[in-house]
Amino acid sequence: MKNPLSQALRCWSEWRRQQKLHGRFAFGDARMQLGRVILPARLHTWTASSRLANEADITRADDAWQVRLHDSGLSFFWPSEPDQNLHFVIEQEFSAANPHHYTTAPVRLSPESTVLDVGACEGLFAFRAINEHLASRVICFEPSGRMAALLRRGAETNGLADGIAIERSGVGSQTGRARMVAGDNPDAGYLEYLPSGDSHPDAVPVTSIDDYCRSHQLALGPGDLIKADAEGADLDVLLGAGEQIRNGAPQLAITTYHVDDHAERMIAWLRQTRPDYRLRLKGFSFWTAKPRPVLLQASTLR
């Protein structure tokens, strides 16, 4: 069982450490939804179940579950029977109070924006971006064949397929092949690179953002966005976009909670590569026993 005082002190200590390292972690951003982080999970289970029942209709749809959201009218498909945790998947896309929400300031999108969605999973972020005219197109990278198929199904069900491209590929620091390792949840799988020449029945292609943009004659600019939730490969995604970041300064929204030192390493690299970025670090997560910042955002727009 969580000890709230102990958890709060550990978050305070980590916030102080981050402040000393780079000074880019406002206290208000560090304490976003802190009660959810430090209090016992059972206190949130009932609330999440109740909210999920009120915000969505969930029905079996062949080999998946269709989730229809009341407020937005959007639907997405989930591969396993949903539980109360699905509420948090929905909340992070529609509530700016959630530190995992990708499009808070300093990120600013427009109907002309191009978004690269790395780790698109069920596609709810992409659906919202097109539906709310936050972007003209979203290129979704999803290495899981199962999730990529459900993502496509959701795009077609919502009538948004024209604005969404789906690449069944992982994204990392280099182009190659990797095997997809399934996680305990549909949004918690990860990629493991294969040595050159090796094969594996679950192997999937992996690209870097720079290689992808080069091969597709795509140049990202300050109004575009790289969004990434890459289950631990987030720093590799960033490093593999170095050319686009140096030349075009696209906006960034990248998760930082999968690996202990990702937040500070990303900030150090971005300060060296594009010192004109405005940076924002948000929230805490106990993904493991140590509290880690949730999300890093960057933009040169004023």
Regions found by a protein language model. Name each.
Residues 121, 144, 172, 233:
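Conserved glycine-rich SAM-binding loop
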Residues 141-142, 167:
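Divalent metal-dependent hydrolysis catalytic cores, especially in the metallo-beta-lactamase
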Residues 146-157, 265:
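Short alpha-helix adjacent to the SAM-binding motif of class I
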Residues 74-104, 161-162, 167-220:
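Glycine-rich adenosyl-binding loop in Rossmann-like folds that engage adenosine-containing cofactors
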Residues 135-140, 147, 211-302:
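Conserved acidic-Pro-Pro-aromatic motif
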Residues 109, 160, 273-275:
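Short, structurally constrained coil/turn elements
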Residues 156-158, 181-186, 269-273, 297:
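Short, hinge-like loop/turn segments at secondary-structure boundaries
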Residues 1-135, 139-141, 150, 277-302:
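S-adenosyl-L-methionine
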